[in-house]
Amino acid sequence: LTTNLVVADSERTEKTICLAVTPALKAYGIGGRARLFEVVQRVNEINADRRRKAPGGKFTGASSDKKELEAHPELELEFITAKPRMALYKKISVEIYNIYLKYIAPEDIYPYSVDEVFIDATHYLDTYKMSAREFAGAMIADVLKETGITATAGIGTNMYLCKIAMDIMAKHIEPDKNGVRIAELDEMSYRRLLWQHRPLTDFWRVGQGYAKKLEANALYTMGDIARCSLENEEMLYRLFGVNAELLIDHAWGYEPCTIAEIKAYKPENSSTSSGQVLQSPYPYEKALIVIKEMAELSTLDLVEKGLVTDQLVLDIVYDVENLKYGGKYGGEIVSDRYGRLAPKPAHGTANLGRYSSST
């Protein structure tokens, strides 16, 4: 966790999304789902600052280790780009899940991603005569023994606080001798420790769009949102509709949903989606071929899952490179989320009038 590393396929393009970013790099303000070019830009900024502060104004070497960089200001910050190996990650994920099954019944485990699970340990602590921290530590130690992989854990009185304890607190504390980081939160400690925490995007389910709306209304922290819910709740519902209810709950550290309820949930409707990041700007003819291929794959996905649909949605986001080709683009230009000028994204919806899974 002290290594500056991102998981991304650098052979594709610098616009590729990083599937993971280590805490060492996140500490410099790099997001967990940054694009590779963002990481490069931020590292260049960091190194410009390090060079100014280095003895003699120059580097004598480079390192990707956080502790070594902290001890040696004359070193340039490097980062490792590791190519994704999803088949291997899934295999190891299954191995780790099976270790958890030695302690926990499957109905009390909710796999959140390939490297993250929620566990409801409520009814196991008395059985094992352990505290929540001891129980988490025992499972992590078993995983380390069997796989050589250490872990970070968040413990909370609900699923939201577990996630926040891990994302914001555990990943930023000093590890023990085995590299393990464990943090705990309840509703009161959450308010005491994190109501003033910034940025808002560090919190689960608060993306750039939510943060931008909140900050435009002078709400910069979870404490601000909680106070607003007492004084001007209507504004939050006006901004976010029914989703304001969840935002308010989270601002106070509440989360009523449990693993049992997640597993019992049966959605009335389903949706499927697919997306592609192209290597370079495509002309209309080539882009149309890609869209048709995606439509074919979506159809096969519907058939495989036994689903039908009566609505299709297509979104196209254009790259800044489209503005570099001799002024051929004549449409509207907007700023993207990185502050760069780019053609305005396109959005279209088609209502079929009947349900179908056919092309």
Cite the ranges covered by each PLM segment:
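Basic, low-complexity intrinsically disordered segments
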Residues: 1-359
